[in-house]
A protein has these predicted regions:
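Outer-membrane beta-barrel transmembrane domain signature of Gram-negative proteins
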Residues: 20-121, 129-133
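Outer-membrane beta-barrel signature, preferentially recognizing the C-terminal barrel domain
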Residues: 99, 195-242, 271-296, 332-340, ...
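Transmembrane beta-strands of outer-membrane beta-barrel pores
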Residues: 10-14, 81-89, 124-130, 150-152, ...
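Conserved small-residue
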Residues: 184, 292-395, 435, 455
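Single conserved hydrophobic/aromatic residue that forms the stacking wall/gate
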Residues: 1-9
């Protein structure tokens, strides 16, 4: 049998909210704010009709599928056509943003299975995006997946007492990405009609503004392409333990990037030039375990665990680093750049003998930095902000894991789940937590462990305090780099069932164990002023009502 399905969808949203403001005399004044669908404020202009925001979306999708089983053969096919148009109504003078955003594409899938043993599926997508010029607008993205249920073979029957199920999987495919960082129509140049001024006249006293390029067009820009390969194994042991293992590898090419190798003497100056210039790879493995077992009459035990390792690496990047060791090639996408500290300046003579030129007047108790360029063999005696290296671990974890049991004994049940990450770092971007880089709002334990005339420890946890922000001491460096690995008791619950009622106590975010103590490391770097993670406790009961007589 076959069937068809058509869809036409239109949506228009505008948000008008009443809010109030308070002046210096404590008087409240109500104002009207207009917001777009995502909640972002568009305007605070009080003139009705001047500020306006909304969107209109037209989405059309048609689906046709086919399913048939004959003998030991199962065949499924599907064809999809879709097109999408989004019009954002903004009266802010941004003509490009007001133009409709359009996409169009077709997709197809064909799957086949024989006797539940041999599985195959082929997919394809042919998609068009307005972001690219004619000739580069459409991308073709096929994929194929195969599977083999070994445990369904007759020769596997003697092993089923141990290996209840075994399946091998593999897939290969291409995926496309037309997201070019929010920019539109990059194949065409953009011109600023009131650009950089130039002077003329005999005395150079006449200044004019004129049109300048703010972005050069690149008609060759096209889709970013990711090639994905996956190999997996599904295994069940003793009808109780389910294991899933996957290895994945992805290479991404033609990544959209601004050029970094055009010298300024060519006249581009601050004008942007974009292209499909970068590439990277990502690989790792996933592991999941699920165990369920009833023991005797009264016991039931369940355990779940997951583990994922993923590492990405930039393999191509258009750049012109000052030093070769600062190239992004070979680094992870989320690795922070940091200066390397060498403790604190000991005394005025230590400062005087230093060639450190970071900014501001240096003093004893300020952070002392390593001359990285000289360590790499460059003839440079000056320590400045260009003396940086890449950190060891990224700010996005490479290892993510979780585990926890669920145990039931008679009418009593208990469960908990731990979640953790590893190989991750964070950078405290401000001088100290919950503060503003100066003497104000300094926590006691920071003040007690800082460098001071009474505590001239060059390895103090915090440098000297300053009345104003210290440019030298607030550089992104390993002085503020922290290990952000953690393991959390994400949730726990204990319950008791009596007849048709279950009473329980549960909690979420109950405990965090981490070498980083200042705030929840899951929030990442900064100064800790993000909304804190809530610890939640629940007490309740559940009642089952059976209407059967």
């Amino acid at each position: 049998p076959s069937r068809g399905l058509g869809d036409v969808y239109k949506r228009q949203n505008k948000y008008h909210l009443q809010d109030f403001s308070v002046d210096d005399n404590g008087m409240y004044s109500f104002v009207t704010r207009l917001q777009n669908e995502s909640g972002g404020e568009v305007s605070t202009d009080l003139k009705p009709g001047v500020a306006n925001s909304g969107d209109r979306r037209f989405y059309f999708q048609a689906i046709m599928d086919y399913n048939r089983t004959f003998g030991k053969h199962d065949v499924n096919a599907m064809f999809i056509y879709n097109q999408d148009e989004l019009v954002t109504q903004l009266f802010s003078g941004d003509l490009i943003a007001a133009l409709p955003k359009r996409k169009q594409g077709v997709a197809a899938r064909l799957s086949y299975a024989y006797d539940g043993k041999y599985l195959a599926e082929v997919n394809m997508g042919y998609n068009g995006s307005e972001n690219f010029a004619k000739g580069h607008r459409w991308g073709f993205f096929p994929s194929i997946a195969v599977g083999y249920n070994i445990s369904e073979e007759a020769f596997f029957e003697p092993l089923k007492n141990v290996f209840s199920n075994m399946k091998i999987r593999a897939s290969w495919g291409l995926v496309g990405n037309d997201n070019i960082g929010g920019a539109r129509f990059v194949y065409m140049p953009t011109i600023n009609l009131t650009g950089t001024g130039y002077t003329t006249g005999l005395d150079g006293d006449i200044t004019y503004k004129g049109p300048v390029y703010s972005r050069y067009g690149n008609p060759e820009v096209t889709w970013e392409v990711g090639k994905k390969v996956n190999v997996g194994l599904d295994l069940q042991l003793f009808n109780s333990l389910n294991l899933t293992m996957d290895y994945f590898h992805e290479t991404r090419t033609d990544i959209f990037q601004e050029r970094g190798t055009i010298p300024q003497y060519l006249g581009t100056a601050g004008t942007k030039v974009f292209g499909n210039l970068a590439a990277m790879k990502n690989q790792g493995f996933d592991f999941a375990a699920d165990f369920n077992k009833k023991i005797g009459k009264d016991w039931f035990i369940s355990f779940k665990g997951t583990f994922t390792y993923a590492h990405n690496e930039i393999t191509k990047y258009d750049e012109s680093p000052k030093y070769a060791f600062q190239s992004k090639v070979g680094q992870s996408a989320n690795i922070p750049s940091i200066m390397i500290s060498d403790g604190l300046f000991k005394d005025p003579d230590d400062v005087k003998n230093s060639n450190q030129q970071i900014g501001g007047n240096l003093s004893a108790g300020d952070i002392k930095y390593v001359n990285i360029s000289k360590l790499y063999g460059y003839d440079d005696d000056i320590v400045d902000i260009s003396d940086w290296v890449w950190a060891k671990n990224p700010t996005v974890p490479e290892i993510v894991y979780g585990f926890g049991p669920s145990i039931r004994w008679k009418n009593l049940d208990f469960s908990f789940f731990f979640q953790g990450v590893a190989k991750v770092s964070l950078v405290m971007s401000d001088f100290h937590p919950f503060g503003d880089n100066s003497l104000r709002n300094v926590l006691t334990w920071i003040a007690d462990d800082r460098w001071s005339p009474d505590n001239q420890n060059i390895n103090a946890t915090y440098p000297r305090l300053t009345r104003d922000t210290s440019v030298n001491n607030t550089q992104r460096s390993d002085y503020w780099l922290r290990n952000a690995a953690f393991i959390k008791l994400k949730n726990a619950e204990i319950g008791y069932t009596y007849k048709n009622m279950r009473f329980y106590v549960s909690g979420m975010n109950l405990a965090t164990f981490s070498p980083f103590k200042h705030w929840d490391p899951e929030q990442g770097g900064g100064n800790g002023l993000k909304y804190p993670t809530q610890r939640v406790f629940n007490f309740g009961f559940q009642m089952t009502i059976n209407n059967n007589r």
